[in-house]
Each structure stands twice: as C-alpha cells, then as structure tokens.
From Swiss-Prot:
This is Phosphoribosylamine--glycine ligase. NCBIfam families: purD. ATP binds at residues 136-191. Signal peptide: none annotated.
Amino acid sequence: MKILVVGGGGREHAIAAALSRTTGTEIYAAMARKNPGIARLAKEICLTPETNLDRIAAFAQKTGVTHAFIGPEAPLEAGVVDRLSAAGVACAGPTKAAARIETDKAFCRNLMAEYKIEGNPAYRVFFDPKEAIAFVRDHDGDLAVKPIGLTGGKGVRIMGEQVDRAGAIEYIREINGGVVLEERLTGEEFTLQAFVDGTHIVPMPLVQDHKRAFEGDTGPNTGGMGSYTMPDHMLPFVTKKDLTAALSIMVSVVAAMAHKGYPYKGILYGQFMNTAQGPKVIEFNARFGDPEAMNVLTLLSSDLAEVVTGITEGTLSASNVSFEKAATVCKYLVPEGYPSAPKTNSPISIGETGSAITYYANVEEKNGTLQTLSSRTLAFVGKAPTLAEAEQIAENAASSVTGEVFHRRDIGTQALLDRRIAHMKEL
C-alpha cells in the first residue's frame, strides 16, 4: 500500500509508525513543518500548510498514493477528504460534511437531539451574543460555554471552574459569534475511540487524557499533557455498563450520520463525562486524539494498513482488529511557559530513554539538534504489563530530557488514579 499521512504532530508520528510496521507499506507525508520522526519513516515528504488542498492533491497524484490517513481536524474541516476522494485516493477520514460532528458543536448537539440519542446534556445554541449573555445572566446554575467552531481543545470555559458568571459573559463577548451553552457536567472524563467504515464500528481501548498544564490537574487547559490505558482496556472508574452505554451512543451517532446522508468513515473520538447518571457526551472529534492515538496505536497488534482498507471499503470487522493486553502511559514534554507563552527555539537533549517509545511533535531538528517550537514538543510512551511499570518507563524517559521543557510527573501514577476513583465514588 502507498499511503499518504496528512499532518505533522505526535499523533501523526504514531500513525506513521503503526503503518510502518506493515511490510510493503510506503509512507508519504504532507505536513506544515518537518517532523523528524515522520520524515525518517516516509519515502517522500511535502512541506505545505495542511489546509492547502491543491498542494496535497498534487502531491498525492505525483506520488501515486492509493490511500490517505488524515491526522488533524483543520484539513478535515477544509475538505481534504472530498478533494482526495475526487482524485481517486481512498481516505481514512470523514468528508467535510461528516467532519461537522467535530467542527460544528451545534450540528453535533442538534443531531443527537433530533435522533433522541442518549448522553446529550441540556444545551442551547445562540448566534446572537446579546441573547447568549441574557441567557447566562438569567440562568440558575453553572454552564459550559463553547464556541461553535474549532478551538484546538482549548476553547471551552466552564463556570464555577475557570470563570464566574461575569467571566462567562466576557468570554461570550470575546467570541462574538455562535456559542453553545450547556449544563455543566460533573464526573470523570474518559475517551472512547473507534474505527468506523460508514456502518460498522470497532472500539479501541479506553483512554484518559489530562488537559490541565500542571500537576494535580491545575493550570490552564492544553491540547493534552499525557494519557494512560489499563491492561484490561477499561478504566478503574468506568464499569462495563458505562462502556456499553458510551459505545451505544457512538453506534447511534454513526447510524444517524448515515441516515442524514453523511456516512462517517475514519476515526470517531468520543469524549465522555462519566456522571452519576452514566456517560454524557462532552464532544466528538473526527480524528484520533493527541495524545490518545499514541496509547492505542502503541497497543495495536493488528495491521493498520488492513484496517485502513476496511474503513475505506466498508469491510471493517472486529475480528481483524486486536490490541495487546498491556498498560500504556504517555507523557508530553512541553516548552517552559506553555501554553500561554512558550519558549521557542530552545535546544533540548534526549538522554537514556530505555524501552520508552518516542513520538516527535512540535519540534525542529537543526544541524542534529532538537529545538522547541510553540506547542507540545515530544512524547514518550511506556508500555508494560502493569500501569506502575508503564508509568516508570515513561517517567524515566521524560526525566532524561534536558532543556527548557517540563512534563507532568503525576500522569499514570497510583496517587492520581486513586483521586479519580474517589471522585467517582463521591458522585
């Protein structure tokens, strides 16, 4: 298979690494900046903005790729799948219309409401900021304020957590566009990702991501500082009943999309809040999570190229998808000052990483030296029979890096896990 990977982050390095495990797979990559990890795996790369559909389509035709795997959300929103499909390239990724499950928060909520799909929190959509502000002023209780469009995982403000009522009103003024106001959900977050071929849905191991920048879940929201999976592919605060409910919601969404005339193909990412009433949908993403892709793709023991064929041809089957029964812990290194004022162009050096897997993200290689850029730098994944061992592998590797970077030492630790379990019991 000759396959094009679109995107140049840690998630895309994990996708390329998983594809490279298949003998005879030729990888080509289109990305805005040269990712050193992807560049080593690719036969040829094209440096281009990931929303430049002309350049990407021309590169696909020049190289003769038969398939494409789309990593980030921006090219999906721009319609890269529609463009590549028209050029005869089979894509693991949704069309522009289907990607609205992520790129348009109102579309997602309204679809769930129309098809009476479980797990939809109470919500209101406003296109006039004045009406949204009036609703917030009169509403008794806390709300989540979400811009309708893409925000890179950093655009939500939650009353009672990040902002008060006045702060929420100020944020709506700042957005000055469409917003979704939702009931504030209380519980523990978890991620369920699935391969989807338009009809069939094959779930992956559950993952928990950590959005806050600093230890103890403090500080500003980020794109994700790290994540973990358990050896049984569950999470300690998610029951089998909860998992069944979450998967049922995703199956219903895929069926609703097909019924609407937007069949969904690619990766569907469900971010859920496990509440006292069961799982509620925080949001859907139209692609792998970053960092969650690094956990599940490290565990994938079946052939990703075959899975891509199943997605594109509508022949996806759970019998062809298997994951190793092991724990994983992913820890991101980020520049000092991240996310608000990251130190850029700062050299870093990687020490002894042991058995950890390294995934390069927003990092530049200059004359053999790695330098930080403005976002998350690189990630280490530890894989082991137990969570404690996986955490130690990731932590040792992350601690080996010298330079103006930091990471969250608490991700994957028993202490943090115990807090999650205790929090769930309190509900």
